[in-house]
């Protein structure tokens, strides 16, 4: 249950944004493009030299079990997050991680707003740019998304629904 979910304040994802994630849809009992999502998650973890600790089939089964335990079949957005694990102390060196990876699966019912379907969304081109791949690879769904958060804030202040970020 949501009110019982807990993650350590020493988790590397919380302290440093050290983790990867995927957004997955559940529609009519099927996980949409699950193989591609898991492949990208594992490739992202590999790029960060991070072990997930489960085989892809095992992780898929955990996602399915979580949705089944919550009686969810369709119209569900799943945020799958994996962090390096718990740190001995707040410090960026991965060698001080003292636990297995933390895996979080959050399934939620998310339907588009009627106004979005009718009118679309308003975009605002923000001054915040996407980073170069050698700084923050855009192909990685990493937890550290501060530039995206800054872009959302700027778009909201401009009266837009979403930010449009340009490449460097």
Where in this protein do the model-derived segments appear?
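Short, acidic, Ser/Thr-enriched surface-loop or helix-capping motifs
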Residues: 166-168
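Conserved alpha/beta cores of soluble small-molecule-handling proteins
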Residues: 1-164
């Amino acid at each position: 249950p949501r009110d019982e979910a807990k993650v350590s304040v020493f988790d590397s994802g919380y302290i440093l944004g050290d983790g990867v994630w995927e957004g997955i849809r559940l529609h009519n009992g099927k996980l949409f493009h699950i193989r591609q999502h898991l492949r990208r998650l594992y490739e992202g973890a590999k790029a960060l030299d991070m072990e997930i600790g489960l085989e892809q089939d095992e992780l898929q089964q955990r996602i399915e079990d979580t949705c089944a335990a919550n009686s969810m079949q369709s119209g569900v957005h799943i945020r799958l997050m994996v962090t390096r694990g718990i740190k001995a102390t707040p410090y960026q060196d991965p060698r001080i991680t003292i636990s297995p990876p933390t895996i979080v699966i959050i399934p939620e019912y998310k339907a588009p707003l009627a106004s979005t379907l009718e009118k679309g969304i308003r975009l605002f081109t923000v001054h915040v740019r996407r980073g170069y791949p050698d700084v923050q690879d855009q192909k990685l769904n990493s937890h550290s998304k501060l530039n995206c958060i800054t872009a959302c804030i700027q778009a909201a202040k401009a009266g837009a629904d979403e930010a449009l970020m340009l490449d460097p």
